[in-house]
Amino acid sequence: MKVVQLKIENFRGIESAELKFDGHALLVGSNNVGKSTICEALDLLLGPDRLNRFPPIEEYDFYNGRYLQPAQVEGEDPTPVKIRVEALLTDLSAEVLKRCAKHLEFWHIAEKRLLTEGEVKAATPGISIPCLRLETVGEYDPAEDEFNAETFYIHSPDAIEGEKETVRRDIKRLFGFLYLRALRTGSRALSLERGSLLDVLLRLQKVRTGLWEQTISRLKGLDIENDAAELEPVLTAIEERLSSYVPASKAGRKTKLYVSQLTREHLRKTMAFFLAMRDDQEAVPFQQAGTGTLNTLVLALLSFIAELKPDSVIFAMEEPEITVQPHTQRRIADYLLTHTKQAFVTSHSPYVIERFTPENTFLLARAGSGKLEAMCVADATGLKENDYKRYSRRGLSECMLGKGVIIVEGSTEYHALPVLARCLEGEDSALNPLDLAGVSIFDAESDSQIPKFAKFFQALGLKTFGFYDVKQRDATEKAKFAAVLDVNEEHKYKGFEQMLAAEVPVTRLRAFLQDLLDSGVDAAHYKIPTTLPTDDAAIKKLIVNVLSSTKGAGWSARLLEQCQSSERPTTAVEFLKKIYTYFPLPVVTPATGASAQTP
């Protein structure tokens, strides 16, 4: 079973969204853009237990907390605002096809659309497939002062006109939707509370049959007082004092200690899963295990459930990278991609992002204050899948999540420009720090690759800034750079090292070389004479050779850290200043009114 369309209205931070998927979906984007809200919306619609809690929704599940629309005419009642979550499901299991037969519609595979009423008779296997549309509607009921939500079949031919049939919980269980929240699932995943992963697993395995009756019977037979004789006089004294106020007709012992309240609900909360991971360790409650181990245990449960229902399980997982080491992140991603029908994953981790193809990666962004849009990364032209996978962990994934990217052609610039930016920001409070503004730096490894990556980032909606060496280029080549770069900086030097040698004062270059010698660097290896030359030209030539031979060491960045304000290379400084104009500091409106503080 797969979700191919998802529509969301007035739910949490999303006023409206219409998203299309084709299989697995990695959801990436900035914080608070709506990644988790998509997973929560899927849970509200497909999760079998979400709507059974009371209340199923609350005030802040509505967009901006608005669950009532003010009356347009004075004296009239306000109108309830509705939450709507709609999904179109394909690849339905045989059991769903059978039990939901009258609600089925047809989906055109190639054109990715729902067949209209007149086209259904012409539906052909291989061209169209059965599909199921569901909708969850939530609203506030002023009469009862309650929040309600219910899931319906959108195609309800047997319902009264204007109404829709309700989707029962036993049908929702057939969908096999499982939601692993990054920070919330672990605390109850291995408990027996309703809807927990262990509870779902026991239900699927039919292990719960007779569990509670047998457990309650055994607990009733447990004589706690017999193992603690010192309790006897205490309980007797309590009974004697109780009889002075409340006459008791029961003969013999009137008080009893049990380990729980002997109800199913209380046992669900008190029963605990214990775990031992080492030979020298006794079993402890699962919450006491390491966080990484706990999350891995949760994955183990999820995989168990997926294998029990291989044709229907849909996973939604938030940020698997939280407290989980890189190799486990990769294993989680690989498992979801190969063993589940469909997985929705939110992540900022390059170890997760690199496992998904561009066709399965969606960059979320706000088109307006509350409208959410998703761009498939594969639609960002100019980058082959091999390049995408190769560079994903080298900064590509970080840049995709930002607002702008500085693209350079080598590691010297990659290390040096961030240092120069921090120096400028430290001296001028009017500058918005580039990292906070969402500007990353990306090493394209050669100038010829800059247009390719710039085109990719530009298609994702990022501002692109290129900084590269001068080179003989014809008009066609120059046009490629200009077309995809918001700031197209081809500086006049043949290398960044030459720029530093030409624009940083010789006194600073000499001091830097002397500092290297004093630090104990292998002077012979880097061909630095133990006594520095007095000729300025020789110092400049030496600095170019030294910096060129140590690109990975970041010595250019170290030189810039030592420069005073007046000593920094003007060409690079002016380039960064152009970028700052794209990202000014946010305007902070001072507080007004009675709460405002005056000096």
Regions found by a protein language model. Give the residues of each.
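Conserved beta-strand position immediately N-terminal to the Walker
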Residues: 24-27, 178, 405
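Extended helical coiled-coil dimerization/tether regions that scaffold
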Residues: 189-192, 199-297, 301-313, 476
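Switch/communication elements of ASCE P-loop NTPase nucleotide-binding domains
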Residues: 1-47, 273-398, 570, 581-599
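Acidic, Mg2+-coordinating catalytic modules of nucleic-acid enzymes
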Residues: 394-407, 411-599
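Short glycine-/polar-rich loops that comprise or flank the Walker A/P-loop
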Residues: 81-85, 130-134, 173-177, 312, ...
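Conserved catalytic network of the ASCE P-loop NTPase/AAA+ motor domain
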Residues: 19-20, 30, 75-80, 125-129, ...
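Conserved P-loop NTP-binding catalytic core
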Residues: 40-128
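Electropositive, glycine-dotted interaction segments
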Residues: 92-211
